[in-house]
């Protein structure tokens, strides 16, 4: 099962890296590729929630987290929202562990150094209230109306607040270090 899960990761990481290859593409999958990008994001979220522990201690974990971060940074709030459950899962697994286990027996997922700080940086940038006056403004191409845009971005900001609260509650020292830039 481990080998099969890794093979699935490798199969999907290629298209993810291709879609999100350059900084410009981190921001936009392009309208014509949006459905594919959303399906790819959903697949990676589902895979991550079930198998990310298999990547622990390898360079693949950093690659996977960077891909998920790129999806979170996407200008389409629908894509970014797809990643929220994964981030909540990752915070729980890396900072709290399985809460049904006694504290002394909990095993935490080891995430790369500096990752909490990077996640907080993205959260802060996504928390900025976006401005969209007309559907001619970017990223309006992803939304049916200005109202739809504002509703989706508000929902995203609320979910990001939830992640921030979990981080602050679970690892206040790590959050404090990240805020100080250390």
Predicted feature descriptions by range:
Residues 1-81, 86-109:
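Long amphipathic alpha-helical scaffold regions
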């Amino acid at each position: 099962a481990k080998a099969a899960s890794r093979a699935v990761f490798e199969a999907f990481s290629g298209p993810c890296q291709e879609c999100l290859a350059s900084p410009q593409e981190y921001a936009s999958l392009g309208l014509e590729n949006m459905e594919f990008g959303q399906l790819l994001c959903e697949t990676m979220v589902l895979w991550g929630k079930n198998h990310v522990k298999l990547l622990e201690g390898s360079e693949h974990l950093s690659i996977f987290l960077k891909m998920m971060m790129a999806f979170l940074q996407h200008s389409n709030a629908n894509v970014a929202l797809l990643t929220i459950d994964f981030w909540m899962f990752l915070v729980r697994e890396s900072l709290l562990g399985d809460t049904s286990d006694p504290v002394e027996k909990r095993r935490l997922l080891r995430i790369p150094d500096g990752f909490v700080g990077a996640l907080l940086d993205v959260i802060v940038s996504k928390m900025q209230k976006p401005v969209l006056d007309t559907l001619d403004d970017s990223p309006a191409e992803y939304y049916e109306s200005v109202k739809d845009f504002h509703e989706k971005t508000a929902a995203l900001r609320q979910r990001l607040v939830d992640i921030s609260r979990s981080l602050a509650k679970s690892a206040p020292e790590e959050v404090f270090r990240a805020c100080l830039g250390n």
